[in-house]
Amino acid sequence: MSRKAYLILENGTVFEGKSFGAEKETMGELVFTTAMTGYLETLTDPSYFGQVVIQTFPLIGNYGVIPSDFESKVPSLRGYIVREWCQAPSNFRCEGDLDTFLKESDIPGIYGLDTRALTRIVREYGVLNCKIAYSGEVTEEELAEIKAYKIEQAVESTTISEKEEFKAENGDLNVVLMDFGAKHNIGCLLYTSPSPRDSTSSR
């Protein structure tokens, strides 16, 4: 049976759901995506570094985990919020389920809460800081800590450590990309370079 989990917003609002993925408390900026497909791309998109992401589409995980769909090698987000996750994924490329992937990536998730009501709050008030916790009781000190959260060292945490080459089947252009947290879906012969670099080091 899944453990109860709570999403605490910086304005004091608390949503109750159930835990999946890694069981750990975490804080982040609360954002949402309305994408109906591509949850693996969302999970591995470096632009979500430091954020807790809400999926508004009600069922997530139905085609499992497919590494070739990843936008980066590992997830950069801090937490993952869904209405329901599929416990029996089906796809000929599937290599695992969402719960196991989140556990292995040390990403906590919550399911079973009203993601659309939560999204309306974000739309009305803008980006809010939040905390994934396992107690619904909130102290003033805890709220102050949530409000003070800031995303730091995003580039340093998402850039690569050494140069890489990505080959495109039909690419006839060569591009050097300075990696400040780049995504993998680019249709050229691509060389990535760690950040920061001067112009001569990319040659």
Provide a role label for each language-model segment.
Residues 191-203:
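Single conserved hydrophobic/aromatic residue that forms the stacking wall/gate
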Residues 2-174, 178-188:
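RNA-binding accessory domains that recognize and position tRNA/RNA substrates
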